[in-house]
Regions:
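Surface-exposed, low-hydrophobicity segments enriched in Gly/Pro/acidic/Ser residues
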Residues: 1-194
Length: 194
């Protein structure tokens, strides 16, 4: 929601040294004093904001709840030549692999065993949570897709035509205006409950 903010305080250990980012409420005795925390989302979703690069742009909302039963999610790409939505990138080096598998989001079967089944992996709390799906890469249709395509042998200039970087460095409204890049659709079916 645009009127909500998200901030965190956390500790982590690196090289045997413990670091703290922000302040914990439990460390304070005076509850009327402000806490210093790390902002992850503010009310202004603008690329010029300092936290823009920290935002989770690999998260897509499906609905209020999503149940594993009958969950099927795929990524489709609209072909420039036919206008048809394809489950693969139409380049020789990668056309035998579905987009969802190329993006690393189809590694498991329906029983969460290592064997892709052609659909987005449903792992409660990890890839699917609170009606949202989480792709494994921060920019699945941007720089991460470019890196994956080039690693599979797609020439750099050719890979660039499939990349939608504007989805990650512009607002959603601005990115939707770029019809020549807005060619990906999440399609599928799921059951939800309230």
């Amino acid at each position: 929601n645009t009127d909500q903010v998200v901030a965190v305080a956390f500790e982590y250990t690196h090289g045997g040294q413990t670091y703290q980012v922000g302040e914990f409420a439990g460390d304070r005795t005076n509850v009327s004093e402000a806490l210093f925390v790390k902002s992850l989302k503010n009310t202004s979703n603008s690329p010029s904001q300092g936290n823009w690069n920290l935002m989770m742009k690999n998260v897509y909302r499906l609905g209020d709840t999503v149940e594993k039963e009958r969950f099927r999610l795929d990524v489709k790409y609209q072909s420039d030549t036919t206008g048809v939505y394809l489950s693969y990138i139409p380049e020789e080096q990668v056309k035998k692999q579905t987009i969802i598998k190329l993006l690393g989001a189809d590694r498991l079967d329906n029983n969460n065993r290592p064997n892709s089944n052609g659909y987005f992996d449903y792992v409660e709390g990890y890839t699917v949570s609170n009606g949202r799906v989480f792709f494994p890469e921060p920019e699945p249709f941007g720089r991460d897709l470019y890196r994956l395509l080039v690693a599979k042998g797609v020439p750099s200039a050719v890979a660039q035509k499939y990349v939608f970087n504007e989805l990650y460095d512009n607002t959603r409204t601005a990115a939707k205006q770029m019809a020549e890049k807005d060619k990906y659709n999440l399609v599928g079916q799921f059951r939800g409950s309230s």
